[in-house]
Amino acid sequence: MHNPTRIQWRRGLTSLIIAVLRFLVHSNLFISLATVSVAVTTIFLANLPLESLPLFIVFAATMFVYTVNRFTDIEEDKQNVPQRAAFTKRYGRYWLVTGIALYIAAVGVAITLGLSGAAYLFLPLVVVLLYSVGGVKRLFFVKNLVVGLAWGTIPLGVGYYYGQLRSLEILFLFVYITTMITIAAVIFDIKDIEGDRTEGISTVPNRFGPGWARISSLVATVVVAAAVVFLIAAGMLSRRYLVVLAMNAYVSMYIPFATSDRGPLYYGFVVDGEHVFLMVIVLLTEWLVW
């Protein structure tokens, strides 16, 4: 016989874990951790010393951009992700204040320390204006590219901070991250099909269908993996960069299951968690192999 107390305890634990994950996703803490993961991955793969300041800057900029976006997209979220819309309506103003404060702090620290690239910290504000206010998200596929490029600037920012902007490793990670995030952005649009149609936003899934979006994204992921292997085989990149193929494998596994009825945790935790996964794999290989 099953122990009722144990079953109830397991259900309670499961509910608690789900509640915590939803909080991390809806509050943008998890997506901010994901962008920090990109910075950490870049630092280790490019053999740079780990410092806290660039990580803080990335975290603060992400929290600011995504929290503002929650407010500008709240009408779409009411249909696509009602739980997130409810969270934003109830707690969003507190997280908005937090995001703005962190962003101002990051800019202030950069200026105070005399960082040469401090002016580039205004790029997140430009992204917010273009994407959320300027109507870029209504342009077919352009919004996916903007998201991809925004994430791709993280390796560039890390490279600039350490004076390695033109190194092959940094440039490779810029292209790689930009491409992989663009693919993820297309997959993300699958959950937003109905809301995007209502708002008149044209995306790959609502123009060609979710099936075509999954197939094209999977093909693109395989092509990226093949390009990585080619660069390594040609001696342009170290064999250490084979580790990024772990993310291609991860992405290839979640793409087939991306449907419009998947909950916010699938997209906000599983899909957005791809870079956290890659960071963990990179750290493990650095510790155990290299």
Give the location of each predicted region.
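Haloarchaeal acidic low-complexity proteome signature biased toward cell-envelope/secretome components but also
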Residues: 1-26, 262-272, 287-290
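Small-residue-rich segments of transmembrane alpha-helices in multi-pass membrane proteins
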Residues: 33-39, 86-94, 145-161, 206-212, ...
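Solvent-exposed interhelical
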Residues: 58-109, 179-227
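C-terminal ends of transmembrane helices
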Residues: 66-79, 127-140, 185, 189, ...
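Intramembrane alpha-helical segments
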Residues: 83-163, 254-263
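Functional transmembrane core segments of multi-pass inner-membrane proteins
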Residues: 144-197, 211-214
